[in-house]
C-alpha cells in the first residue's frame, strides 16, 4: 500500500477540481468532460483503497455510471446537432457562435433557443432526449431504480472518497438535471 499511497491525494485533487468544473462551466461539452473526470478518480479510489469487496463495488460503480454517461452523451450530441449557430444575445445583438459545423455547446444559448422556438423540433424527440438526460442524472443522484450501485460504493470506498461521494458527487446529478434538463426542456419536465 505504501507504493500506491502517493496516488491517493492526487486522485482526490483531480476529483475535487472536476467537481468544481461541473458546477461552474457554461459549455455542455466541457460539463460532460468534467462529469466523466469525476468518475475516474472515484473508481480508482474505491478499487485501490476500498474495503474487502472493493473490486465488485468499483466495477458496479463503473458499469452503472458509465452506462448512464453514454446515454447522457447521446442526448447531448442530439442537442448539439440541433443548435442554431445564429444566436440572439441580450439587447438584440446577434453574434455567430459555433465551430466549422455551425453548431455549439453553449448552455446559455441553448437555453435561449429552447425558450424561443425550441431547441429540438418534434415533441417526441424532445421527450426522448430529456429521458436520456434524466437517466444519466438520476443514476448519479441516485434515484430508484438506478441507485443500487450506491450502497456498495459507500461501504467499500475509503473515508475520504465516501465523504466526497455523499457530500458533493451525488449532488451533481440533481444540479445537472436542474441546470440542463429542466431549463432546456421545461415542457418535458412538466409532463
Give residue ranges: language-model regions.
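Short active-site segment of divalent metal-dependent hydrolases/proteases
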Residues: 38-39, 143, 174
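Internal transmembrane alpha-helices of multipass membrane proteins
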Residues: 1-70, 154, 158, 167-168, ...
